[in-house]
């Protein structure tokens, strides 16, 4: 009996020891904390959070959050174009480490796992999004990000009603860079020096200049994009780039003390058009011509040009586009089409042209239409073709208003294999580019 009593006593001591250790590791079981909830619900329009890493490993993601006293949080972010907030649950718990805010269920902030790439994505995938409350700084709430384990701070700033209405514009300004980074370049120029153009990478909203050590986290703004910290370019400190009104795809630009930084889109490397192929106009070629059926699937034909200029509908394309030069000044932009039972006919507008800045400029057109077969083009059953031809003529002229770059390509296109092939790209709207035969003199 004595041995049994001693054994039971030993077991009892063992269990007590294990429980004591658990108490040290987690001295306070998680309980709802009304004090933190009170802080979170105090801002009438909620809070805004710029989620960005302190080491430029991922850039700025904008979130708006409005908490209620029933444990619900409504969110909006620049991760999507929607203007409709989404609602999920949250908790404010008192733990051994302090007051913890936990986001429950799926909401805007959980989309970070899909938006981020690499190690940053792994750190945000399949996790409970938790922030440790560390106190107030003025009107702001300060937290430690428990996801990352690097003591990174996140700041909740009081939001305004205007913040909620402008969030879709933030998405609109950042998404072109995210989706087409491979075609964006950063040009840094001064009033006197030769511009320097950098290919870029834009991953996790971090702008990196290729072949350099320069990188900076980026966040969307209502005007364009901003840098998380001052970014030195051309010896000057830049804090933001504004989106140039009307630029498609967007151009982002700023000038500081005579140094201009410009993020611009190009379907080909910027030096692609550095040659003098534009000088072939009126020296070795008298114009350009393409037939849609032979060029629409060419690798150099951009979707924007085909859809907006050449395509009539799902089954019909305009047959031909020509740009013909008459001497050193005059130009004729022509659309040719083959009409059933009526044959081939041309509709054209005339204008002036000029060669400068390595571009072909089209100018001074009255946009008056001329044709030798007005009855054919005016036939009611050809209405869709006429309307598209008019749009095409106007579009080509407008694309040339700020100049068309010209590059002679090392390819042949049947059935005119003997004709040189050129690539023309709009300077103002670089999404509009098209291959075309040169018509030899």
Regions found by a protein language model. Give the residues of each.
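Sec-dependent signal peptide recognition
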Residues: 2-7
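C-terminal motif of bacterial Sec signal peptides marking the signal peptidase cleavage site
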Residues: 12-15
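Acidic/polar, low-complexity intrinsically disordered N-terminal segments immediately downstream
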Residues: 18-108, 134-138, 142-150, 159-184, ...
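N-terminal glycine/threonine-rich, aromatic-flanked beta-hairpin/loop signature
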Residues: 56-98, 190-226, 299-372
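Surface-exposed, polar helix/loop patches in the mature regions of secreted/periplasmic/lumenal proteins
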Residues: 93-137, 256-260, 266-277
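An anionic, turn-rich surface loop/hairpin at beta-sheet edges
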Residues: 102-125, 227-237, 368-405
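Acidic, serine/threonine- and glycine-rich low-complexity intrinsically disordered segments
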Residues: 160-330
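Extended, amphipathic alpha-helical scaffolds
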Residues: 273-441
């Amino acid at each position: 009996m004595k041995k049994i009593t001693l054994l039971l006593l030993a077991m009892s001591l063992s269990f007590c020891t294990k429980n004591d250790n658990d108490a040290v590791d987690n001295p306070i079981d998680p309980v709802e904390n009304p004090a933190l909830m009170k802080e979170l619900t105090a801002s009438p329009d909620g809070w805004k959070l710029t989620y960005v890493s302190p080491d430029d490993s991922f850039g700025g993601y904008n979130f708006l959050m409005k908490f209620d006293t029933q444990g619900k949080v409504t969110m909006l972010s620049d991760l999507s174009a929607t203007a409709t907030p989404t609602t999920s649950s949250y908790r404010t718990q008192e733990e051994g480490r302090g007051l913890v805010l936990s986001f429950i269920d799926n909401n805007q902030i959980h989309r970070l796992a899909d938006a981020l790439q690499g190690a940053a994505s792994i750190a945000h995938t399949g996790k409970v999004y938790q922030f440790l409350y560390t106190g107030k700084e003025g009107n702001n709430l300060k937290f430690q990000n428990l996801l990352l384990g690097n003591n990174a701070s996140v700041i909740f700033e009081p939001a305004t009603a205007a913040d909620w209405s402008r969030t879709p514009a933030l998405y609109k300004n950042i998404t072109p860079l995210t989706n087409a980074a491979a075609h964006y370049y950063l040009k840094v120029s001064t009033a006197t020096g030769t511009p320097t153009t950098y290919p870029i990478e834009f991953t996790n909203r971090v702008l990196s200049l290729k072949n350099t050590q320069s990188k900076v986290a980026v966040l969307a703004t209502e005007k364009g994009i901003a840098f998380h910290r001052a970014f030195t370019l051309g010896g000057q400190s830049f804090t933001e780039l504004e989106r140039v009104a009307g630029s498609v795809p967007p151009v982002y630009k700023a000038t500081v003390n005579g140094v201009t930084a410009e993020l611009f889109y190009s379907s080909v490397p910027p030096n692609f058009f550095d040659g003098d192929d534009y000088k072939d106009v009126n020296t070795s070629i008298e114009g350009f011509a393409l037939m849609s059926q032979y060029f629409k699937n060419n690798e150099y034909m951009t979707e924007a040009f085909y859809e907006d200029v050449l395509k009539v509908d799902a089954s019909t394309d305009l047959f031909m586009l020509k740009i013909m030069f008459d001497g050193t000044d005059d130009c004729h932009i022509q659309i040719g089409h083959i009409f059933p039972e009526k044959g081939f006919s041309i509709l054209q507008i005339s204008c002036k042209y000029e060669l400068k800045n390595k571009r072909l400029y089209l100018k001074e057109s009255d946009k008056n239409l001329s044709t030798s077969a007005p009855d054919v083009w005016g036939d009611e059953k050809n209405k869709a073709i006429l309307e598209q031809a008019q749009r095409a003529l106007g579009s080509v002229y407008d694309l040339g208003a700020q100049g068309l770059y010209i590059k002679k390509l090392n390819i042949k296109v049947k059935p005119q294999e003997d004709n040189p092939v050129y690539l023309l790209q709009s300077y103002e709207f670089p999404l509009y580019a098209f291959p075309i035969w040169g018509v030899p003199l």
